[in-house]
Amino acid sequence: MVAYYHDNTLLHESEILQIMENQLLHTPDGVRDIYNGECKKKLYLQDKLHRTLLKYGYHDIMTPTFEFFNIFGSDVGTTPSKDLYKFFDKEGNTLVLRPDFTPSIARSAAKYYIEDDMPVKLCYLGNTFINSSDYQGRLKESTQCGAELIGDGSISADAEILSMTVESMLESGLKNFQISVGHSQFFYGLTKAAGLSGEQEENLRELIANKNFFGVEEFVDSLSMNDKLRKLFGLLDNFDLQDEQLMEALKLAKGYDEILSSIDTLLKLREYLKAYGIEKYISYELGLISDYTYYTGIIFQGYTYGTGEPIVKGGRYDKLLSHFGKDAAAIGFAIVVDQLMAALSRQDIDVPVIENYSLIVFDEAAYHAAIKRSMELRRDGVNTQMVLKDKNKTKEDYASYAVDNRINRVEFIEE
C-alpha cells in the first residue's frame, strides 16, 4: 500500500484521493459561493448602496484586483504583509491581491488628478482579499462599497462622509446601528505625552483593540504622569462621550497639542452633524483605534446587532497621497457588504428583491411559438427562461421547479 504526507500527516492513497475529490466540490477556507436568492439580494443591496453614493455627486472608479506589493507596503500603513495574498509575475515582480481599496484609489488619484486643486469625489464597489486566520469563519474575500473625498481637509468634508455613511445604513434597511467616531491623534497624543516607548505603545494599542480596559488601567497605573494626563487616559474606556465630557476633556488637554486638537475637532464636528440631523446615530469614543496607521484625523466604525465585526469603517488620511506623489487631504469609508448582509439576515430585515421571471415550457413541435412568446415577454421586461418539455415530467414538476427558483409564472406552449 502506498502512503503520502499531506500537511505533515501520513495518509494512505485512498485518503489522498478522497481529499482531492473533496477539493473538486468545496471552496478553500474563507471564500464561498453565493447563488440564487442570496445572490439576488446581495446584488440588489449593492446597487442600492451604490446609488446612495452617486446621489452625493461621487463618480465611479475601478482599480485593479492586484497591484504591485509596494502599494500596500508597511510604510503605507495598511494590511500587514503576513496577511496579504502575494504572488509573482513573469518578470519576478511581487504582486498582491487588493486587501484595502484606499491605497489603490490614493495611487490612482495621484496619477490621474496630480494637477487638480479642486476636490475629487470617487466611489467604488469590489472585492478585497485578506489572508487572515485570526478568527475561524471570517471571510478572506469580502465585498466593499465605499467612497473617497480627496482634496478637502475641512470638517464639513468629515460631516459629509459621515452623513453618507448613515444614509447608506438607512437605505439598506437597518434601523438600529451606531457609528462610533474617534480621532487618531488622541491616542498618538497620549502616548507622546506619556513618553511611551514603541513597545509600550504597541502593548497599549493591543489592550485597547481587545477592549481589555482592566489591562489598560493596570498599564496606566504603572506609569508616572500628572493627574490631568491620567484623567485623559481614563477616557479610553468611554464608548459614548457626551458634550460636557468632551468639554471637560478639552480643558484637561491644554498643553498637549495633539490631544487638544483632536477633541476640538470632534466638538466642531458635532455641530456640523446637527445640520444633517444624524446625531442620534453617532457616538464619540476616544479609545477608538484602527489597524490602519495611515489615518491622521477622525476615524469611525459602524456596528449593529447580529455581527461582531464592523459593518462600516473609515477615517481621514491626509498624508497617504503624498506617498504616491500628491499632497492632498482625504477622507473615506467602506461598507463591508457581507457583514451588512449577515446583520440584515439576523435581524430578520428583508431585502425586497422584486422577482419578475417567467418560465416557458414547450414541446418540440411548438418551438417557433415558444420563441415568439419568450421574445415578447423579454421585450416587456420579463426575465424569461425556456425549457424543452421532458415527457417524463409533469406540469406539477415544472411548477415546483418554478417555486424553487423564484419564478413567478409558468406557461406551457404545446402544438
Residues covered by each model-derived region:
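Positively charged, Gly/Ser-enriched RNA/tRNA-binding surfaces
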Residues: 38-52, 67-68, 102-115, 122-174, ...
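Short, surface-exposed recognition loops or helix-turn segments adjacent to catalytic cores
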Residues: 176-186, 204, 283-287
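Short, conserved phosphate-binding/catalytic loop or strand-edge motifs used
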Residues: 140-145, 181-189
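Acidic, His- and aromatic-enriched active-site or binding-groove loops in soluble protein domains
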Residues: 83-89, 196-216
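TRNA-binding/sensing appendages of the translation machinery
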Residues: 19-103, 159, 180
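Short, glycine/charge-rich beta-strand/loop segments that flank catalytic centers
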Residues: 63-71, 120-131, 178-187
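Short hydrophobic alpha-helical segments enriched in small aliphatic residues
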Residues: 7-9, 13
